[in-house]
Swiss-Prot record:
<dbReference type="InterPro" id="IPR038526">
    <property type="entry name" value="Ribosomal_eL22_sf"/>
</dbReference>
<keyword id="KW-0687">Ribonucleoprotein</keyword>
<dbReference type="GO" id="GO:0005840">
    <property type="term" value="C:ribosome"/>
</dbReference>
<dbReference type="InterPro" id="IPR002671">
    <property type="entry name" value="Ribosomal_eL22"/>
</dbReference>
<dbReference type="Pfam" id="PF01776">
    <property type="entry name" value="Ribosomal_L22e"/>
</dbReference>
<dbReference type="GO" id="GO:0002181">
    <property type="term" value="P:cytoplasmic translation"/>
</dbReference>
<dbReference type="GO" id="GO:1990904">
    <property type="term" value="C:ribonucleoprotein complex"/>
</dbReference>
<comment type="similarity">
    <text>Belongs to the eukaryotic ribosomal protein eL22 family.</text>
</comment>
<protein>
    <recommendedName>
        <fullName>Large ribosomal subunit protein eL22A</fullName>
    </recommendedName>
</protein>
<dbReference type="GO" id="GO:0003735">
    <property type="term" value="F:structural constituent of ribosome"/>
</dbReference>
<dbReference type="GO" id="GO:0003723">
    <property type="term" value="F:RNA binding"/>
</dbReference>
<keyword id="KW-0689">Ribosomal protein</keyword>
Length: 116
């Protein structure tokens, strides 16, 4: 009986973190990209990205391409840690806009003041 070769198709994931909303350029996108590069864990090791996780920057968007199982929630966690590290967590929040996209937005402070 001939052996049958099975091909494993690697599924690629693409995540986007959109930093265009904060006017005034509060978020330094290059510093955020470096922060993600230094903090993302692969196989429980920091700095083990290799070719499995690719982080790129496009103007004010960060694009993460992975060929391994990767959690979108983990990116939200790292984004919130970066905002806390830069002490701008009080002004910005991380919102999921689509299935693979997060966006940084300001808190709606003006709406709560007008309701009181």
């Amino acid at each position: 009986m001939p052996s049958v070769q099975k091909t494993v198709v690697k599924k690629s994931h693409k995540f986007v973190i959109d930093c265009t909303a904060p006017a005034g350029k509060i978020v330094d996108v290059a510093a955020f990209e470096k922060y993600l590069h230094d903090r993302i864990k692969v196989d429980n090791k920091v700095g083990n990205l290799g070719s499995t996780v690719v982080i790129s920057k496009d103007k004010s968007k960060i694009i993460i391409n992975t060929t391994i199982p990767f959690s979108k929630r983990y990116l939200k966690y790292l984004t919130k840690k970066f905002l806390k590290f830069k002490q701008i967590r009080d002004f910005l929040r991380v919102v999921a806009t689509t299935k693979n996209t997060y966006e940084l937005r300001y808190f709606n402070i003006g709406d709560s003041e007008s309701q009181e």
